[in-house]
Amino acid sequence: MLGCRGCHGKDLEGTFFTKNEPQYGPLYASNLTVEIPEYTDAQLDGIIRQGVHPERKTVWGMPSEIFQHLSDPDFDALVAYLRTLKPAGKKLPNPQFSVQDRKDIASGNYKPAAQLVRERANQLPVDLGAGHALGRYITEVTCAECHGPKLEGNPNDPVGRIPNLIVVGGYSRDQFETLATRGVPVGGRKLNPMMVSVALGRLSHMTPHERDALYAYLKARAEQPQ
């Protein structure tokens, strides 16, 4: 599910996204079970891959900067799945911006999805050839959301230090499997809770072939001259 449940909730019925951050919003991740039927496939493409809403025009919080790289078959499969959801719960309110939100927007710290799509369109992980195409693609549409478009990390992220994925060079395939499926890094050290959530909620649900490809790409990337 490409992490949809991380914001939209385990049942995709939406969440009060800023519930524990009263300085923001209130901002809600929409209830996909009731909103998906309201849009055509083309409109969903605009929202998900382009960051453009057919009514509100501007989309906030959607990681369209990475979803713009979704292949057409994967996008079609995602939409086909979303259209199988039975409506449940209620439609949630549109975004409402607090004073802090508006300050962040004015300073450029909080950007609309369409702007991020434009800014990051050509910022991609290094191309290591056809043999690593699948692994690179997976990083573009998953890892890049937190680790950045070139997977270089962010030592100053508010949620905690996010490393350059060159660190995977220090993992064996078995160690990477433990990290990806159980959220346990080399040495058993404490991992950022966000990464534990990503491992258990996303990476562990990939096929072994996909994790093989992801590891092979990240390992090869780590072995490139720095």
Where are the model-predicted features located?
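Gly/Gly-Pro-rich "capping" loops immediately C-terminal to redox-active cysteine motifs
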Residues: 9-45, 59-71, 99-107, 148-178, ...
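C-terminal capping alpha-helices of c-type cytochrome domains
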Residues: 42-49, 53, 66-92, 174-179, ...
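Proline-centered turn/helix-capping motifs that create local helix->coil transitions or kinks
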Residues: 7-12, 90, 185-190
